[in-house]
Amino acid sequence: MHANPLSSFNRAQHGNLTNVEASQVKSAGTSSTTNIDSKNIEEHVADRLSDLGRPDGGWFFEKSLGTLKNLNLEQLAGIHDVLKLTDGVKNIVSFGAREGGFELAMQFRHDLYRSQHPDENSPHDAATHYLDAISLQSNKFTKLEKLQHVDVFKMQNPFWDVGYKNGIAHAKKMAFFITPEWLGSDFCKQEFQWLSETKNKDIKSAFVIFKDVDLKSKNMTSIFNFADFHKSRVMMASTPPESGLNNVKIENSVDLNFKRLLTDRESWELNNFLGD
């Protein structure tokens, strides 16, 4: 997601998904070590993490669980599950969750799924179009905590960055919704850094830039330079009064912020890019 290990999202978020999507989210990431000997799981996980490259400052789980050698078998299985889940990522989306960014990403993901699977009952992999708040929801180490006095949960997984980096390593496309909130998030900017550093040289990228972004900022200069060098697609979103996206029904939820919108043409262009 945009991604923040503490991803805020509105109550009954499952309402963003069809029944098929929701059931597959629940089943896609059940922790299992059936295809790897438990005696070798530490070595296997260590090799995979080494190949991904340790982030600046260390893996997120090191802050709460300790180094890889300190992890027990269940925790190692949790990492293995995250890696297995994100090996199938096709597209990955980076967004700032605040000020309507989360709702925009969820709407766009929903429309992208439906364009590829017009039949609501058509099966698909829940992690194909990766938003970490949703795609890691089935992992047993993902925890939800309701924030007091507001209709919002936060989601936390100690292995979120493992999944995100692995998603980038396998994805064919990566799209960024660039907003002031994205630029203000260290997690979002870290995702851009991971794209810059990935060994996946076949990944293509697109940047959807909203009109309230300071185009002359240092961060935007880095993005434009990257996009120019890698021939990324750059779209300037017009932020219309009405969205070209289909509204996603989120039952029993209040105060959703649909500030971030795309026109029909903008939505079609990005959908077409990710759907190739």
UniProtKB/Swiss-Prot annotation:
For this protein, what is the EC number?
3.2.2.-
* Region described as TIR domain: spans on this chain: 165-214
Q: Does the record bear NAD in its keywords?
A: yes
Which Gene Ontology terms cover its molecular function? hydrolase activity
Entry's localization field: Host cytoplasm; Host cytoplasm, Host cytosol
Phenotype on deletion?
Answer: When both genes are deleted no 3'cADPR is detected in infiltrated A.thaliana, bacteria grow a bit less well in planta, when the genes are deleted individually reduced amounts of 3'cADPR are seen. When both genes are deleted pattern-triggered immunity is slower in infiltrated A.thaliana.
Spell out the protein name for this chain. Answer: 3' cyclic ADP-D-ribose synthase HopAM1
Keyword annotations for this protein, in alphabetical order, are: Host cytoplasm, Hydrolase, NAD, Plasmid, Virulence
Gene name in the database record: hopAM1-1
Q: Which organism is it from?
A: Pseudomonas syringae pv. tomato (strain ATCC BAA-871 / DC3000)
Q: Give the record's subunit note.
A: Homodimer.
**What happens when you mutate residue 207 to A?**
No longer toxic in N.tabacum, N.benthamiana or yeast, no change in plant subcellular location
